[in-house]
């Protein structure tokens, strides 16, 4: 299986660089897995597609202002993108600089805060904050929202709200779980009132989600690792939902990966809680254990995420759906439109 099999040409003007005026004002392309049928909808139409008794699983991670700007004592400027908070003082980060910082290099941040480079781990740098404040407090003071590279503009004040789900709770992500950006409080309340069950997992999306696949053979790709948590209440709700013959609907590929990671860890045993790092890589041929349907945005060409949805609804079906979306001028990527996918028979 070749990475090039998941390529497509996207006109630059279809990349959404700003969100819609209202969260739920996006368009929605539905793809029925069993038949391959497509339908053009509005995101608000999703309400009619979710049945009482269905379980919707959301990722409640909170995006941290993970981009920092600073300079070394020599005056050399650098940009830091947090990959993961190790504790209250230490981070793993990507560092962009004309020269990579060496161990013990001091970095002066905006706002008079200082960090020290204490170790290097392959492409990532371990940095320690030299302050009485915590990393999270400093990020909230001087950090910038880590907009994806393809948005290609500086972050603005509005991004602090719009590049964040309304139900965010646990800080740690450096990219938004973007399928969730379409939901507002009113829609969530309406779904609950309809009898739809709502549950939350956590997966702290890392910057690796934007890293290109650098091999030709899909099977040779090594996934980045991210921290995920699937608590007991979610496990119980999934069991109840399945027993009643209803659907588990994941909102976003991060929710999919969280649930399927829990299932993978259990092997042939019943689903149980999961908390820890996951590097699950889902590509065509994978058999889904938990998820019956999903809400997702449109993904980058040759990305692991387009491979995931192709595993869910079929390679040819996804290719045709994306061709249709481009022809109909859907908006792509993080601030773009959404899809509702049901699983192809396995």
UniProtKB/Swiss-Prot annotation:
Catalytic reaction equation(s): 7-aminomethyl-7-carbaguanosine(34) in tRNA + S-adenosyl-L-methionine = epoxyqueuosine(34) in tRNA + adenine + L-methionine + 2 H(+)
Keywords: Cytoplasm, Queuosine biosynthesis, S-adenosyl-L-methionine, Transferase
Single GO term (MF): S-adenosylmethionine:tRNA ribosyltransferase-isomerase activity
One Gene Ontology CC term in the entry: cytoplasm
Keyword Transferase: yes
GO biological process: queuosine biosynthetic process; tRNA wobble guanine modification
Claim: Hydrolase is one of the keywords in the record: no
Pathway: tRNA modification; tRNA-queuosine biosynthesis
Entry-linked Pfam families: Queuosine_synth
Taxonomy, superkingdom: Bacteria
Subcellular localization: Cytoplasm
EC number: 2.4.99.17
Membrane-spanning residues: none
Signal peptide (from-to): none
NCBIfam families linked: PRK00147.1, queA
Family listed: Belongs to the QueA family.
Functional note: Transfers and isomerizes the ribose moiety from AdoMet to the 7-aminomethyl group of 7-deazaguanine (preQ1-tRNA) to give epoxyqueuosine (oQ-tRNA).
Subunit structure and binding partners: Monomer.
Name under which the protein is recorded: S-adenosylmethionine:tRNA ribosyltransferase-isomerase
Origin organism lineage: Bacteria, Pseudomonadati, Pseudomonadota, Gammaproteobacteria, Alteromonadales
Gene name as annotated: queA
């Amino acid at each position: 299986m070749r990475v090039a099999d998941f390529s497509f040409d996207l006109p630059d003007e279809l990349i959404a660089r700003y969100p819609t005026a209202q969260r739920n004002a996006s368009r929605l392309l539905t793809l029925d897995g069993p038949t391959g049928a497509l339908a053009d909808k509005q995101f608000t139409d999703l309400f009619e597609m979710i049945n009482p008794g269905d379980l919707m699983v959301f990722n409640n991670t909170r995006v941290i202002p993970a981009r920092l700007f600073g300079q070394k004592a020599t005056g050399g400027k650098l940009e830091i993108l947090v990959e993961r908070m190790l504790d209250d003082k230490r981070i793993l980060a990507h560092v962009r600089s004309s020269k990579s910082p060496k161990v013990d290099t001091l970095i002066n941040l905006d706002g008079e805060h200082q960090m020290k480079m204490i170790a290097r781990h392959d492409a990532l740098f371990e940095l320690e904050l030299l302050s009485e404040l915590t990393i999270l407090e400093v990020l909230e003071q001087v950090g910038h929202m880590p907009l994806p590279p393809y948005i290609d503009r500086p972050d603005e004040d509005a991004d602090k709200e719009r590049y964040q789900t309304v139900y965010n709770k646990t800080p740690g992500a450096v990219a938004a779980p973007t399928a969730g950006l379409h939901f507002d409080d009113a829609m969530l309340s309406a779904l609950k009132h309809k009898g739809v069950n709502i549950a939350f997992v956590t997966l702290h999306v890392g910057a690796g989600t934007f890293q290109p696949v650098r091999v030709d053979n899909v099977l040779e790709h090594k996934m980045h690792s991210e921290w995920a948590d699937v608590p007991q209440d979610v496990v119980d709700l999934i069991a109840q939902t399945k027993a009643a013959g209803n659907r588990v609907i994941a909102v976003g590929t991060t929710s999919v990966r969280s649930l399927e990671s829990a299932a993978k860890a259990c092997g042939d045993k019943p689903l149980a809680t999961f908390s820890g790092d996951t590097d699950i890589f889902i590509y065509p041929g994978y058999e889904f254990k938990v998820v019956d349907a999903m809400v997702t945005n449109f993904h980058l060409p040759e990305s692991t995420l387009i491979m995931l949805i192709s595993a869910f609804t079929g390679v040819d079906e996804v290719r045709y759906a994306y061709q249709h979306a481009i022809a109909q001028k859907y908006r792509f990527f993080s601030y773009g439109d959404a899809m509702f996918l049901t699983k192809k028979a396995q």
